[in-house]
Structures are given as structure tokens and as C-alpha cells.
């Protein structure tokens, strides 16, 4: 596209944003309002007007995919070479390669960046070296605390008394100090160090900061609402000379507080950059009017936000369907049936339909419902339910308790949780079993009797054998759910996850609880094992359905769009998450509401919101209540009904 033809394809507000080239600009871009088009057009305009060469423009994104897309779109508008487009980490790494010696830390520009797994291994090694009790102070949690401190721009020497109030924090500081020493000795950095040391470099060396301020005269930052403290400080320092910074974001879509994102960064932009211009992109090109009205009415209940209202010039579209279901199982059946109907009536292809859940554990009931209806589906951002590590672990415990000859099951669980059974001991057990043509479990029993097991492993293996024998007996006389709960307790598996106290571990516990709900539906444990195997093996061809239905969490769906969206589980305690409310109070509620807003605005044409009147928790049917977010959606844009069509007065609050 030559000259400035691209300007004429923009709406008035988009044009204002593109033509604003001097001074700080906050571009509040609502969902589906064309922010990427504006960003790329703005870069093209700066180059076209000869305000800066491509080498003097810095555009920062959160993902390599977004950076690549931005570069391609800029090049489609104007031919340019040398534009600096990349992620926060890639741009920070580039600066450190050139300037690392000025930090005087002993690092050189051949440093390597270590993976998450290597970071965690180093933390574990230090914890072991320092003889720290891992039951009280889980290495994974220590690593998370260290990463969070780095996201806040805090080196060990900068930690305040308030940062180390708790015993866990004091232990984490001790590990952090040793962790950083090890990194420096090895000439390696982790991802958190890249921006952390960039900022240290800028603070300690004003000449280097000035060099990059001159180099990057125009700065553009995408998804500004997702920046953490260290990213925010980095951008602010770089922009403090010329102040030609354009931050694009939507405070209503700030949903990553749990991983360090600070919505306050976008809310205080005007204070950080005096005289800043704020432009709101509110014309939505994605969704129908009822969908936008629902999103606006929900998010308007948040107090800490920049006010904006999405609108569209598209036709009104379908009303939002809000469906009450008798139970969570009925909810899954209803959604699977409705999707089957939409596809068979050729209204939509399966590939244009999504189910967006608040938490990963919710996917199980939908997976099973789709298998029953032979509808192809895919899980995005995670494994299918029965393929998840913790589910496979528990299944292995069940299998070895039913069939003591199951070598694969035994090998999976023998050191989960850790039982100090090393590779040498395992090889010895395998060799003993092969020589005598018996199972590994039988070999362990014999070796315990004749003293062939080393003292270090003897007690743990003897304890495990006793427990497996006990579970084997219990399965013949007790309900499966009771035995599996006993396995989780007796084995220490549940305790292992609880002691981890991480977001990941909490998600695994939620998945196990969901698995227990599934087990509770079976009187015979063999039927459950067979059922789970069939679910894992199921594969439905997509040919006749126009692709697969997408199942994913609301967090994973950010930035995506679908013709039809189903939002299940809109019940108090599920969504908003009770955990968020308990831990974060009003702040947590506002983030939950932003997650709801993101979910609603993924829909282009049709939106279904469902909730269950009851959920089965083991043997108990627990009453559920509609989410407060449902009450925030006006009646006039909805059709509210029951999946059983027995009544429609449930919503007369």
C-alpha cells in the first residue's frame, strides 16, 4: 500500500491514534476494535512522515507470534528495514549482549539463558545443600517467590523487611542469594534476569540509558495491561527522554494478576506521563450488539477502570441464551446436544464453536459428553483430562492395586511421592523379576523377605507393598470412591501436592477432585478403568463436522474469537472463583469480572451462558446458585430458560 492509503481504511478514532505522533499516548483498545491494525498503521505513518527511521522505532509485544505478525503487517503497509520488533525478553537480551560487561558482575556477552526446568533444578540443589526441609518449604514455591521478586525488580539486596516477613520468604531470600551467585559463576541468566539487569544497567549508567533513549525515539508497547513491575520500569526509563511512547491495552482485559501483571500500570499512565493523550477505541468489529451490551453491563460493575463502552454498527443479532441446568452432568449433555444440533443444521461448523471454562477440571464432563455424541473436540492449552500427569498417576495407583502384576503402573508410582528408590535399586528389582519370570511387585516381595533390598529403600518399599496389599483387599469389599480416597491419603500423593502450595499444584488437586466425582458414578472400579481407557483412546474424525469444537480455559482464549461461544459453570464459587474471592477480596472479584468480560467478547454471533443448579461432590448433591455476573446482564438482551424446559422462573431474583 503506497503513500498513506492505509489511513483512509481507519475509523475516526483509529485515525487520531495513528496521526498522534508526538508525546505520550495511551490507546485504550476494547476487544475486537482493531488495535493491531492501528499499531502497525502508526508505525508505518511515523516512517512515512520521516519522523524516525525504522531503526529508531521500538515495538514490544508479549509473544514471538505477535511480534512476527506485527512485522509482517507493517511491511505490507510500507517497505522498511531494521525495525525493532520483539518481546520484552528478546529486546532486553539484545541490550545485555551489547552492554553486560558494564554491570561488573563477571558476566560476559556469551551468557546463556537457562530453561524453567534448569532453574527449578538449581533451586532444588540449593535447598538440598542448605538442608532445608522440603516438606515445609517446597522448592517449586521458593522458585515462584524468586521469580515474583524478579518481576518486581527486586534483587536479594533490595528486599525489604516487609518482603521477608514470613518464614517461607526468609528461606526464599537465602536460596535467592545462593541462586544468583550460581548463575553468575556459570555465566547464565534466567528470563527474569534479562529485564532485571537491564534496569540495573540503566540506573547505574546514565550514558548507556541515554544511548538507548536516543536509539529508540518512538516506543510502542502492546498489551500494556499485562505488564509487570519490571517491564513497566524498563519502558518508563526508555521513554523518559523523548516521551514518544504509545501504550496499547485494555484494562478490562487484565486477567493475569496471578502471574505478576499489574493493572495499575495502565490505570496510572497519565500520572507517569504528564500531558498524556488518551484515545479510546470503542467501535467493535467482531461481535453483535447483544454480546457487546452484555460485556459492557458486566464490566461496568468494576470500579477501578477507565470508562469505555463498546459499540457496533452491525445488525442486532441473536439474544444471549442463559440456560439453567439441573446438574453439571446435565449441563455438559445440554451443551453437547446443542452443538450437535447447530452443526447438523449447518448453522455453524464445529471448528467455529468454543467452550470456555473457568478452570481446567471442568473439561472432563464435556469430553465425555462429546464422546457419547461422537463430536470431534480438541483441548487447547492443555492435555485432555485423562492424559494429565496427576490423573495418570492416580490411575496407575488404582491399576497396581487391582492388578499387582502391572509393571508399568508400579514403575510410574514407585517414586511418586519420592521414596528414595534409586535407579540401581530399580534395575536390581527388574533383573530379579526377569530371571524368575515374575512381576516386579512379586520380585519386591521376595527380595524383602530374603534381605535383597538395601536398608535405605527397605522401609519405604515394605510400607508401599503393605499399602498396595491393603488397597487390593479393600477394592473387593468397599465402594471405589472410598478406596481411591484412601489411596490418595495413604500414599502421600495428595499431601505432596498440598505441600507444594503452587498454582499448578492447586490445579492438579482440582483435577483429582473432578476425577473423584467421576469415580463416584461407578459401583465397580473396573468399569471406571475401562471407561477412562475408552475416553483416552477416543478419536472422532473431523471431516463431517467442519473441524473440532475447541475446549479451553478463559485465560487461554484471550485474543481469540469464535462464531459461537458456550460459557459453562457460571455459578457462585465456580465463577467467580471462591479461591479468588477468599484470597484477594474486592481485587479478586474485579479480576474475575474482567475474565467474564474476556469470555463474553470472544463470541462473534452466538453466546450461551449456562449454570447448574447442583453439583455432585462425591456422594453429596450440593446446591449451586447462579453467578452474580448473570444478574448483571440485562433481561431485554437475553433468553433465559431451563435445559429441561420445565420452568423459566428461576431467574426471578
Swiss-Prot record:
Chain ranges of the UvrD-like helicase C-terminal domain: 289-559
Residue stretches making up the UvrD-like helicase ATP-binding domain: 8-288
Catalytic activity: Couples ATP hydrolysis with the unwinding of duplex DNA by translocating in the 3'-5' direction; ATP + H2O = ADP + phosphate + H(+)
Coiled coil: none
An example Gene Ontology CC term for this record: cytosol
UniProt cross-references to InterPro entries, sorted A to Z: ATP-dep_DNA_helicase_PcrA, DExx_box_DNA_helicase_dom_sf, DNA_helicase_UvrD-like_C, DNA_helicase_UvrD/REP, P-loop_NTPase, UvrD-like_ATP-bd
Gene Ontology terms, MF aspect: 3'-5' DNA helicase activity; ATP binding; ATP hydrolysis activity; DNA binding
Keyword terms of this UniProt record: ATP-binding, DNA damage, DNA repair, DNA replication, DNA-binding, Helicase, Hydrolase, Isomerase, Nucleotide-binding
One annotated GO biological process: DNA replication
EC number: 5.6.2.4
Chain sites annotated for binding ATP: 32-37, 286
Pfam families to which the protein is assigned, alphabetical: UvrD-helicase, UvrD_C
The keyword DNA repair is annotated on this UniProt entry: yes
Family per similarity comment: Belongs to the helicase family. UvrD subfamily.
Function, as annotated: Has both ATPase and helicase activities. Unwinds DNA duplexes with 3' to 5' polarity with respect to the bound strand and initiates unwinding most effectively when a single-stranded region is present. Involved in the post-incision events of nucleotide excision repair and methyl-directed mismatch repair.
Name by which UniProt lists this protein: Probable DNA helicase II homolog
Organism: Rickettsia conorii (strain ATCC VR-613 / Malish 7)
Amino acid at each position: 500500500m503506497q503513500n498513506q492509503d492505509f489511513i483512509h481504511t481507519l475509523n475516526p478514532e483509529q485515525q487520531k491514534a495513528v496521526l498522534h505522533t508526538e508525546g505520550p499516548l495511551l490507546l485504550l483498545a476494547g476487544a475486537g476494535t482493531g488495535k493491531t491494525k492501528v499499531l502497525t498503521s502508526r508505525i508505518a505513518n511515523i516512517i512515512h512522515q520521516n519522523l524516525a527511521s525504522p531503526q529508531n522505532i521500538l515495538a514490544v509485544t508479549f509473544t514471538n507470534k505477535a511480534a512476527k505478525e506485527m512485522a509482517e503487517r507493517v511491511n505490507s503497509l510500507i517497505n522498511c528495514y531494521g525495525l525493532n520488533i520483539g518481546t520484552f525478553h528478546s529486546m532486553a537480551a539484545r541490550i545485555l549482549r551489547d552492554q553486560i560487561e558494564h554491570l561488573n558482575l563477571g558476566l560476559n556477552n556469551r551468557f546463556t539463558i537457562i530453561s524453567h526446568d534448569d532453574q527449578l533444578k538449581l533451586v532444588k540443589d540449593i535447598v538440598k545443600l542448605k538442608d532445608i526441609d522440603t516438606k515445609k518449604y517446597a522448592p517449586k514455591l521458593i522458585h515462584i517467590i524468586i521469580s515474583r521478586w524478579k518481576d518486581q525488580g527486586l534483587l536479594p539486596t533490595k528486599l525489604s523487611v516487609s518482603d521477608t516477613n514470613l518464614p517461607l520468604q526468609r528461606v526464599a531470600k537465602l536460596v535467592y542469594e545462593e541462586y544468583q551467585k550460581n548463575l553468575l559463576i556459570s555465566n547464565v541468566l534466567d528470563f527474569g534476569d534479562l529485564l532485571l539487569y537491564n534496569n540495573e544497567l540503566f540506573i547505574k549508567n546514565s550514558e548507556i540509558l541515554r544511548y538507548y533513549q536516543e536509539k529508540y525515539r518512538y516506543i510502542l508497547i502492546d498489551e500494556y495491561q499485562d505488564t509487570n513491575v519490571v517491564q513497566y520500569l524498563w519502558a518508563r526509563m526508555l521513554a523518559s527522554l523523548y516521551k514518544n511512547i504509545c501504550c496499547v491495552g485494555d484494562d478490562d482485559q487484565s486477567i493475569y494478576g496471578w502471574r505478576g501483571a499489574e493493572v495499575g500500570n495502565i490505570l496510572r499512565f497519565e500520572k507517569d506521563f504528564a500531558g498524556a493523550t488518551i484515545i479510546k477505541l470503542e467501535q467493535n468489529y467482531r461481535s453483535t450488539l447483544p454480546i457487546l451490551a452484555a460485556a459492557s453491563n458486566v464490566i461496568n460493575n468494576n470500579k477501578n477502570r477507565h470508562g469505555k463502552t463498546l459499540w457496533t454498527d452491525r445488525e442486532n443479532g441473536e439474544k444471549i441464551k442463559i440456560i439453567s441446568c439441573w446438574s453439571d452432568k446435565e449441563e455438559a449433555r445440554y451443551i453437547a446436544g446443542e452443538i450437535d444440533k447447530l452443526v447438523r443444521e449447518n448453522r455453524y461448523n464445529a471448528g467455529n464453536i468454543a467452550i470456555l471454562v473457568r478452570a481446567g477440571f471442568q473439561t472432563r464432563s464435556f469430553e465425555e459428553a462429546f464422546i457419547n455424541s461422537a463430536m470431534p473436540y480438541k483441548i487447547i492449552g492443555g492435555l485432555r483430562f485423562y492424559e494429565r500427569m496427576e490423573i495418570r498417576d492416580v490411575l496407575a495407583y488404582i491399576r497396581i492395586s487391582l492388578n499387582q502384576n502391572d509393571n508399568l503402573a508400579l514403575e510410574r508410582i514407585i517414586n511418586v511421592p519420592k521414596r528414595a528408590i534409586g535407579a540401581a535399586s530399580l534395575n536390581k528389582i527388574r533383573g530379579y523379576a526377569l530371571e524368575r519370570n515374575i512381576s516386579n511387585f512379586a520380585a519386591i516381595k521376595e527380595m524383602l523377605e530374603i534381605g535383597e533390598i538395601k536398608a535405605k529403600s527397605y522401609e519405604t518399599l515394605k510400607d508401599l507393598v503393605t499399602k498396595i496389599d491393603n488397597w487390593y483387599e479393600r477394592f473387593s469389599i468397599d465402594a471405589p470412591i472410598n478406596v481411591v480416597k484412601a489411596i490418595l491419603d495413604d500414599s502421600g500423593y495428595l499431601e505432596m501436592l498440598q505441600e507444594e502450595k503452587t498454582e499448578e499444584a492447586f490445579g492438579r488437586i482440582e483435577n483429582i477432585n473432578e476425577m473423584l466425582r467421576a469415580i463416584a458414578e461407578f459401583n465397580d472400579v473396573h468399569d471406571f478403568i475401562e471407561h477412562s481407557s475408552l475416553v483416552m483412546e477416543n478419536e472422532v474424525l473431523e471431516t463431517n463436522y467442519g473441524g473440532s469444537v475447541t475446549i479451553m480455559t478463559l485465560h487461554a482464549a484471550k485474543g481469540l474469537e469464535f462464531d459461537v461461544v458456550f460459557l459453562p459453570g457460571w455459578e457462585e464459587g465456580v465463577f467467580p472463583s471462591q479461591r479468588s474471592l477468599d484470597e484477594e477480596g474486592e481485587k479478586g472479584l474485579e479480576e474475575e469480572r474482567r475474565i467474564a468480560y474476556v469470555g463474553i467478547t470472544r463470541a462473534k454471533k452466538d453466546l450461551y451462558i449456562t449454570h447448574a443448579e447442583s453439583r455432585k461432590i462425591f456422594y453429596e448433591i450440593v446446591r449451586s446458585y447462579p453467578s452474580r455476573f448473570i444478574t448483571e446482564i440485562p433481561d431485554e438482551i437475553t433468553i433465559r430458560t431451563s435445559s429441561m424446559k420445565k420452568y423459566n422462573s428461576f431467574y426471578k431474583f
